[in-house]
Amino acid sequence: LKLNQSMPNFAVYLFSGLVLINLFNEAFSNSTKAVVDNSALVKKVYLPRELFPVASSIIAVVNFLPQLIVLLVVCGFLGWHPSFVQVLCIVLGVLIIVILSLGLGLLFGAINVALRDAQNIVDMILLFSTWLSPILYNVKLVEEALGPIGLVIYNLNPVTGAVGLLHYGVWAPTTAQTPEIMALMGSDVLRFGLIALMVSLILLVIGQLVFSRLEKSFAQNL
């Protein structure tokens, strides 16, 4: 695609997306396996079972923070000059990923106790997560390929919304932020970011409800 020839600071664009998708992949995968991996504790010690996927998500965030710090230090050398709103977008993008991965982790983690094949579904989702978000390419290319309606559907992916927010907060302030450059991220980054937050919260509620319903049978299934 030769994106490095059409986008300023493409390395920042790429890395800012990768660190966020790595957070999602690690938190989602580990949360899904958390109950099964701690089966001895689940069967012998009474603890809130949600503790295991939550702890897995916290560990993923701890692993993510040094990567984010390195990224921001590099951006500082490239003239990073974010506005207050752009800084908030970084926080919101990370928050969306944490909420989303925890919600999905609770959902698939509960199912995985009874049906171990659920982990294979998660692995399939993670396999495509990088390609279904604007990390290796920009949103303008998606619009050209899918058209306006296809772009809207594409942007409804909450991971896409979160990555867009991080690009807006991290990558955009290292550029001149001209209309042509900002168009590479799409014109509705903030709106789709808020939609991503709502979708993630809904999935968190669904995940918690399913987890609470199935946890009564955890001990016998493990």
State the predicted function of each range.
Residues 212-222:
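Short cytosolic juxtamembrane segments of multi-pass membrane proteins
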Residues 28-48, 58, 114-128, 135, ...:
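Intracellular alpha-helical coupling/juxtamembrane segments of multi-pass membrane proteins
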